[in-house]
Amino acid sequence: AYTPTQIIPLRMGLAYLTLWALRPKTMKLPWKDELMFILIGITGGSFYFFLQNTAAAHTSAANVSILVSMSPILTVILAQLFSRKGEKLGKLVYIGAVVAIAGVVLVVLNGTLSFHLSPMGDLLALAAALMWAVYSILVKRYTERYDNFLVTRRVFLWAFLTSLPLVLLTDGLPSLTPLFTQPNILISWLFLGVFGNAVCFAIWNIAFKRLGVVVTNNYLYASPFVTVVVGWLLLDEKISWMSILGAVLITLGVIFANKSTEK
């Protein structure tokens, strides 16, 4: 009923309304901060998902998964270049990143040994990874200054608003009729908007504040393996020896990287 691009404003809008209903408190911001929140909404919301979805149309799902999983190492680089306070990082964080990325590759390939380059799609996926890295650095800065709940809500507001031009220029605004006439679509929408966005982003932003962006984003390396496990549990998909080895490498990589950031 909906294209991937049309789903973006639907889930972002629902996430914003959910958080607003839970705390209908006005958040007044200086105009400079408001501009930064627009950028945060773009990098962590509208453009991040748009680039990822568009990449999937031009390259394989394996390529997208592997390249988007590069966001933690890009976060490390940006944290060193632009973070005001700076997170102390040692050599182990880079070793851990290499080990974890190797694990991600094994998990995503899952025994197929098939990886084909597709320049346009691959660059879009890498751009999505960069978007998330920028979002991570910026949102941590503002969760230290403002209430995390209100920050997350503001991010979704701008993610929703900036996704509208993308939809208008591509697939057109989505009709709301299927949401109320097809129960399976309604359930999927509620899951994506309430849990996938509102709840998960709020928790993730808390982790940014408490653990730092580098440590928190290191756990993104585990995402492909979690996907494989869920596929095994719910869809009866097979897990190969490559996936198991990949999971071990991901775990070791995260341990190495997090050890490096311990103060």
Residue map of PLM features:
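Hydrophobic alpha-helical transmembrane segments of multi-pass integral membrane proteins
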Residues: 4-21, 39, 93-102, 120-127, ...
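Helix-helix packing/entry segments at the starts of transmembrane helices
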Residues: 9-10, 45, 49, 64-70, ...
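Specific transmembrane alpha-helical segments of multi-pass solute transporters/efflux pumps
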Residues: 20-68, 102, 106, 193-211
